[in-house]
Amino acid sequence: MVKKHQNSKMGNTNHFGHLKSFVGGNVVALGAGTPYLFSFYAPQLLSKCHIPVSASSKLSFSLTIGSSLMGILAGIVVDRSPKLSCLIGSMCVFIAYLILNLCYKHEWSSTFLISLSLVLIGYGSVSGFYASVKCANTNFPQHRGTAGAFPVSLYGLSGMVFSYLCSKLFGENIEHVFIFLMVACGCMILVGYFSLDIFSNAEGDDASIKEWELQKSRETDDNIVPLYENSNDYIGSPVRSSSPATYETYALSDNFQETSEFFALEDRQLSNRPLLSPSSPHTKYDFEDENTSKNTVGENSAQKSMRLHVFQSLKSSTFIGYYIVLGILQGVGLMYIYSVGFMVQAQVSTPPLNQLPINAEKIQSLQVTLLSLLSFCGRLSSGPISDFLVKKFKAQRLWNIVIASLLVFLASNKISHDFSSIEDPSLRASKSFKNISVCSAIFGYSFGVLFGTFPSIVADRFGTNGYSTLWGVLTTGGVFSVSVFTDILGRDFKANTGDDDGNCKKGVLCYSYTFMVTKYCAAFNLLFVLGIIGYTYYRRRATANSL
């Protein structure tokens, strides 16, 4: 009776811990999404600090450096301790907005200080965001898609939430905006230091998987062949160690117990450790020293195992394939997010639309809202959809990436639609800006689906041990791709710009070539992902038939 009561008490405590970690992770994610707020305060900041607008592209690239390139460092810290990562992230964001506030208040014309602040904002934000996603994916292994969708979607929604609050509360007072962001975002990310936890039973689900994966990675480039898209469900041989005092373990989750029984892969543990001799003169201190030594060795072994697992994963063809897929779609999405304002301006400057009383700032603000809102919807809906695909149809989460690639293809084709044949300027303007708005919605939703699904794909494929490090490396692909796509767009605008006032006045011709390139890239991505799905399906069938 006492044991049953203790188990019940432990279960309630465990549920509370999961809930606290989940809620805290969502608060952290909401506070960490302010890199997308740059366009809200950038014009006033540059004007106040007497920095030319031409430097804005370099400043926005500083955000990308902090959130993507330095994301590798953030991932390593998260894998060590999500709490520590949130503490570091909170300090970085606090210091960054403090520096921006001082630059704005004292009119310091220092591109270096502002760039440094933006790097800190990018790094601090992903430090908190990666920690929240890691805890969601690890603590809820049977519902990774749904659990991970909440912090991912709130991160995408954060920009719209804070831009609305700042505009309502402070209006044009950017100095107060920086103070508000410094306190609010810093404190929200700091919540993770007190709430985020990785529960041992969830990590334990992946422990034997990691050992099997490391053993298998020496035999084949594909480290691991999952039975379904869930990192706890694997077909494989038990890990055999050269040490006589080790366990042989199979890792199969409860919800696929029937499958494990069908293949005669029942969970079991075998130990050949020698029994203590009755005459052995051991005291309780001997056992304590022995346990302490074993714990130390176990921790060192776990760290070494994680590093080896990450290294083997980085070399795998699957990881390289994921890097290409994510890099292309991430680059297209970020290019559109950073550049949609220029597309609106090109339409406004094109005759005869330049004769109409069009509020370009309002249309640009609408695009930001659509991108943020639809990105939130995509991130939130993609998780449950991918879970449904896995559990109901035993399909792969990569089908969501097929949908995202298809949406990017359609939006890239639609944005280049030319309405110059319409003679009525008002009708032409209405059609043109409606077309851009629809494309913003499509691009936003596809971007949300991409980042709402890919964290679960990575966790399913490579496990949660070393997950944040791998995710940090994966997101670096966007740094290079967005640089390429924005360079193509810049050349496209330059080729169609006259010498009079520096504005492109040729409508969709200002950017049509760029989106022809993105259309072909999306088509390649679509076929490439279908190839990965087909190859993975073939490997599973071959593995199942060989048992």
From Swiss-Prot:
Disordered: region residues: 275-300
Membrane topology per record: Multi-pass membrane protein
List of residues that carry Phosphoserine: 237
Membrane-crossing residue ranges in chain numbering: 22-42, 59-79, 84-104, 111-131, 145-165, 176-196, 324-344, 399-419, 438-458, 470-490, 515-535
MF annotations from Gene Ontology: transmembrane transporter activity
Residue ranges annotated as Cytoplasmic topological domain: 43-58, 105-110, 166-175, 345-398, 459-469, 536-547
Topological domains annotated Extracellular: 1-21, 80-83, 132-144, 197-323, 420-437, 491-514
Coiled coil: none
Name of the protein in question: Uncharacterized membrane protein YMR155W
